[in-house]
UniProtKB/Swiss-Prot annotation:
UniProt superkingdom: Bacteria
One Pfam family hit: APH
GO biological process, one term: threonine biosynthetic process
Disulfide bridge map: none
Organism ancestry: Bacteria, Thermotogati, Deinococcota, Deinococci, Deinococcales
Organism: Deinococcus radiodurans (strain ATCC 13939 / DSM 20539 / JCM 16871 / CCUG 27074 / LMG 4051 / NBRC 15346 / NCIMB 9279 / VKM B-1422 / R1)
Family as reported in the entry's similarity comment: Belongs to the pseudomonas-type ThrB family.
Name used for this protein in its record: Uncharacterized protein DR_0394
Molecular function terms from GO: homoserine kinase activity
Length: 342
């Protein structure tokens, strides 16, 4: 007699899924397959790939004999072909004017980038020169060298006015990030209202200063981790994925934001920021509006970063972007505004 407690076996039809039919958000590409692509499109002999970083894009070190290069595979839908082309043309422009950057390397057919077909859709890829050197340290000496480098970057970037790239304007820095955050903040109305208010105050302050702000092509992500220092004290820059025409004061404020969000105290950060900004101003002037806007662009950067992360909740998970994430951001903005508000 059959056991009445036993559930009958479920009869299901066989379903077949393939990598092409099941959608993905951000796949991990096999390094052996990428090595084959690199060998074919760049003419490198027996390249070996090591994944260095999986962030907005995927960055790998490529070793072919004694030669070392960097391969970036952009995330699907992150940049249009025109935007990728702008970034690579900007790098070529800077290199041509003597700025030490990780320049793009052409494929065997002369193109600066290609497109591969991943599970989630087309993904652009590009090869870059490898920048030797050590990471910048949190010392006034390194901060000053970085400030000089930033001034040289802006000097060299002034003539570059090519179209085809998103602008690092207040819509990009404040309006769009809030739009990305709002779906996650519905669970935390006590945090949503003060975050919206902080963004409104930041926007009002920067809008008032906007007529006097310097504008031009920017790196867009000018924190110290995107630089290397050679034994000859030459600073090289890489990762121009967030570059675009924008406020020069914002470009500088990214370094300040990076320092103050590393858990250092104000007494530790201030000498670094003073050295960075002082070295920049020795080489390149800033307007009164630029100087007044710097702390407000730190707040804008904090909001931009929160929106950047919130926009990828489906990939990172909402537990990662839960209440503690937004509380940390709001606490930072509140404390920052108390020290540097209008």
């Amino acid at each position: 007699m059959p056991d009445a407690r036993r559930r009958p076996e479920r009869q299901t039809a066989a379903v077949s899924f393939s990598a092409r039919s099941f959608p993905a958000l951000h796949s991990v590409l096999a390094p052996t397959a990428l090595a084959g692509l690199v060998s074919e499109t760049y003419g490198l002999t027996q390249p070996a790939l090591t994944l260095l970083r999986r962030g907005l894009n995927d960055t790998s070190r490529v070793q072919s004999g004694e030669r070392r290069t960097i391969l970036r595979v952009y995330r699907c839908g992150w940049r249009t072909p025109a935007e990728v082309g702008w970034e690579l043309a900007f790098l070529q422009h800077l290199a041509g004017r003597g700025v030490r950057v990780s320049s793009p390397l052409p494929r065997a057919d002369g193109a600066l980038f290609g497109v591969l077909d991943a599970a989630e859709g087309p993904r652009a890829y590009a090869m870059f020169e490898y920048l030797p050197g050590r990471a910048l340290e949190n010392t006034p000496a390194d901060a000053a060298l970085y400030g000089q480098c930033a001034a040289g970057l802006h000097d060299a970037a002034d003539p570059f006015t090519a179209p085809g790239r998103l602008a690092l304007d207040l819509n990009h820095l404040l309006t769009e990030p809030l739009r990305q955050m709002r779906p996650l903040l519905t669970e935390f109305p006590d945090l949503a209202a003060p975050l919206e208010a902080a963004a409104e105050r930041t926007q009002a302050r920067l809008t008032a200063l906007a007529p006097g702000l310097s504008w031009g092509a920017c790196h867009g992500d000018l924190h110290e981790a995107n630089a290397r220092l050679t034994p000859e004290n030459e600073v090289g820059l890489f990762d121009f994925d967030c570059a675009g025409p924008g406020f020069r004061a914002y470009d500088l404020a990214v370094y300040w934001w990076s320092q103050v969000t590393q858990g250092q105290g104000a007494e530790e950060v201030q000498p670094l920021w003073d050295a960075f900004l002082g070295a920049y101003r020795e080489r390149r002037p800033l307007t009164d509006a630029d100087l007044a806007a710097l702390p407000h662009f730190v707040a804008a950067r904090a909001l931009w970063f929160m929106g950047l992360m919130a926009g990828r909740a489906a990939e990172f998970g909402t537990e990662t972007l839960g209440r503690p994430f937004f509380e940390f951001g709001l606490n930072f903005l509140t404390e920052w505004e108390e020290r540097h508000g209008a």
